[in-house]
């Protein structure tokens, strides 16, 4: 079981996340922007952060940069959720410390599988 912070401004995607994660043992927190997500992350560090890129107040890249700038948090893997993956995007994701990404639309199973993959990889790191 892992604690996961999700940052997503689209209500429909938040509902999909809730449905997808309901069948798991993970504890999830949903936030509508990166600023709220960062506040939650600073209060209690999760095992994984899943964030949309384009959100009001603080987007995914700014959130990732803020997390990685904090020594107590910079070990937390971050997965970006994006509406499309264009040429060069994967490199940009890496520049902002992404452990992975998933493109919208995604299935609940694809989301769960990617999350499990990233949590397993993070737990196996020395």
Question: Language-model features: where?
Answer:
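Conserved acidic carboxylate
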Residues: 8
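Short hydrophobic/Thr-rich beta-strand motif most characteristic of the beta2 strand and flanking loop
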Residues: 25-32, 40
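Active-site beta3 strand of CheY-like receiver
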Residues: 44-50
């Amino acid at each position: 079981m892992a604690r996961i912070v999700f940052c997503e401004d689209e209500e429909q995607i938040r509902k999909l996340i809730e449905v997808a994660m309901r069948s798991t043992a993970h504890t999830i927190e949903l936030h509508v922007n990166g600023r709220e997500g960062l506040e939650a992350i600073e209060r209690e560090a999760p095992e994984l952060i899943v964030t949309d890129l384009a959100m009001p107040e603080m987007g995914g890249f700014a959130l990732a940069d803020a997390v990685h700038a904090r020594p107590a948090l910079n070990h937390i893997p971050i997965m970006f959720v994006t509406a499309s993956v264009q040429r060069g995007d994967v490199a940009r994701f890496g520049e902002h410390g992404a452990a992975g990404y998933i493109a919208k639309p995604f299935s609940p199973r694809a989301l769960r599988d990617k999350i499990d993959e990233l949590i397993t990889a993070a737990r196996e790191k020395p």
